[in-house]
Amino acid sequence: MNNQPLLLCNNLCKKYQEGQVLTEVLKNVTFAINQSEMMAIVGSSGSGKSTLLHLLGGLDTPTSGEVLFKGHSLNKMSSGARAELRNHELGFIYQFHHLLPDFNAVENVAMPLLIGGKNRGQAQKKAFEMLAAVGLEKRAHHRPSELSGGERQRVAIARALVNEPSLVLADEPTGNLDLRNADSIFALLGELNRQQGTAFLVVTHDLNLAGRLNRQVEMRDGYLQDELTVTGAL
């Protein structure tokens, strides 16, 4: 049996230099996430949560430390290899859906498949199946402007999962939604986790929603803490 973590983060540090000012955003962050695990990171704005997700997704490089995905160091990968990793192994969900406004829902969801080399027919078939999985098969041919906020975020989730990634990185995925839609989105993530075995690493301000996940940690002043402080996490 393979006990290797899906993703391992070792002593990750990130510093930014602006003129004479050195800002340390992440300080010796170490943790692992396993296959099919759902983990929440809570923390106040500016605590380093989004920076951490960018490093984990290979969108930025650390000042020191390393990120290993399935035992392979992102630090040692070429930019092309990291792009391939993002296309095939990682999914991304953001607070704002970032859907392409001139394309309908099924075309938006199919985009990662087309980028990955699938033909249009295969991509559209898989995209429609994914929209059905998030309950939007009847809205497949609507553009983002014709969808509600909750529906747009469901399309974004379908797009993130269409390549069947091992891990989805979600940055405030319910931040722009009302409580009812936020609750529905988190329920959907849990259902997809059970059905597909996808691991989720979710950044959120909502402690109640974070409590639904397997594990909760807090980003505080650049450090990752296992103990949550309610005032610091809201």
Curated annotation (Swiss-Prot):
Pfam families: ABC_tran
ABC transporter domain sequence ranges: 7-234
Record's keyword terms, sorted: ATP-binding, Cell inner membrane, Cell membrane, Membrane, Nucleotide-binding, Translocase, Transport
Listed GO CC annotations: plasma membrane
Entry-linked Gene3D superfamilies: P-loop containing nucleotide triphosphate hydrolases
Localization per Swiss-Prot or TrEMBL: Cell inner membrane
Enzyme Commission numbers on file: 7.6.2.-
Primary localization class, coarse: membrane
UniProt-listed GO biological process terms: lipoprotein localization to outer membrane; protein localization to outer membrane
Keyword Membrane: yes
GO molecular function, one term: transmembrane transporter activity
UniProt-listed InterPro entries: AAA+_ATPase, ABC_transporter-like_ATP-bd, ABC_transporter-like_CS, ABC_transpr_LolD-like, LolD_lipo_ATP-bd, MacB-like_ATP-bd, P-loop_NTPase
Family: Belongs to the ABC transporter superfamily. Lipoprotein translocase (TC 3.A.1.125) family.
Binding partners and assembly: The complex is composed of two ATP-binding proteins (LolD) and two transmembrane proteins (LolC and LolE).
This protein's name: Lipoprotein-releasing system ATP-binding protein LolD
The species this protein was found in: Photorhabdus laumondii subsp. laumondii (strain DSM 15139 / CIP 105565 / TT01)
